[in-house]
UniProtKB/Swiss-Prot annotation:
Belongs to the pyridoxamine 5'-phosphate oxidase family. InterPro entries: Pyridox_Oxase, Pyridox_Oxase_CS, Pyridox_Oxase_N, Pyridoxamine_oxidase_dimer_C, Split_barrel_FMN-bd. Its cofactor is FMN. It comes from Roseobacter denitrificans (strain ATCC 33942 / OCh 114) (Erythrobacter sp. (strain OCh 114)). GO terms for biological process: pyridoxine biosynthetic process. Coiled coil: none annotated. Keywords: Flavoprotein, FMN, Oxidoreductase, Pyridoxine biosynthesis. GO terms for molecular function: FMN binding; pyridoxamine phosphate oxidase activity. Substrate binds at residues 54, 111, 115, 119, 178-180. Pathway: Cofactor metabolism; pyridoxal 5'-phosphate salvage; pyridoxal 5'-phosphate from pyridoxamine 5'-phosphate: step 1/1; Cofactor metabolism; pyridoxal 5'-phosphate salvage; pyridoxal 5'-phosphate from pyridoxine 5'-phosphate: step 1/1. This is Pyridoxine/pyridoxamine 5'-phosphate oxidase.
Length: 201
């Protein structure tokens, strides 16, 4: 493959990402929207964890979390992050690097309202990333939040989304004999024009 044809075709990397994700939703056994999110702490020590991508916007990727969690503190502190989506069923992956901002308005409210009642109550109950004495203590907090918020809990003030606005997106597809296909989209700033380059495997 010498041109960006087939699975790599298109003038918008977000459209390509949406297309690959749609294919993965048909073929991947579990959590096709899982991403390995990488951050760094105040000392520059890297961290990584799996989270679920919840939206591909026209210029950003969106996920939701507890704003008091370790990941949120690191995202707020650095203002930058990276993630990778990898699908064994498709033998493809997407790598993203970019700037981070909060998604803390109507979109966050709407997504929170779409979650199951137990998930919404769990968001209120969990003091994410902090020490927990026992699972029984966690379930007691869930019961307390159930009594407090009933069947229609609003979004907690400490819970919401993050938008990663990329300056780099790489699309990778497996090739025979490890001769993979790689195309990277880069721009200087989120407002700049994209430039596409084929990379060696």
């Amino acid at each position: 493959m010498t041109e960006r044809t087939g699975k790599f075709a298109g003038d918008n990397p977000f459209t390509i990402a949406e297309s690959w994700l749609a294919e993965a939703q048909e073929s991947e056994v579990n959590d096709p929207n899982a991403i390995a999110l990488s951050t760094v702490d105040a000392d520059g020590m890297p961290n990584a964890r799996m989270v679920l991508l919840k939206g591909v916007e026209p210029d950003a990727f969106v996920f939701y979390t507890n704003y008091e969690s370790a990941k949120a503190r690191e995202l707020d502190g650095a203002g930058k992050a990276a993630f990778v989506m990898h699908w064994k069923s498709l033998r493809r992956q997407i790598r993203v690097r970019g700037h981070v901002s909060r998604e803390d308005g109507d979109a966050a409210d709407a997504y929170f309202a779409s979650r199951s009642l137990k998930s919404r109550l769990g968001a209120w109950a969990s003091k994410q990333s902090r020490p927990l004495s026992s699972r029984a203590a966690l379930m007691a907090e869930v019961a307390k939040m159930t009594a407090t918020h009933g069947t229609n809990p609003k979004r907690p003030p400490f819970w919401g989304g993050f938008r990663i606005t990329p300056v780099e997106i790489e699309f990778w597809a497996d090739g025979d004999f490890r001769l993979h296909d790689r195309f990277v989209w880069r721009r200087e700033t989120p407002q700049s024009e994209w430039h596409v380059t084929r990379l060696n495997p």
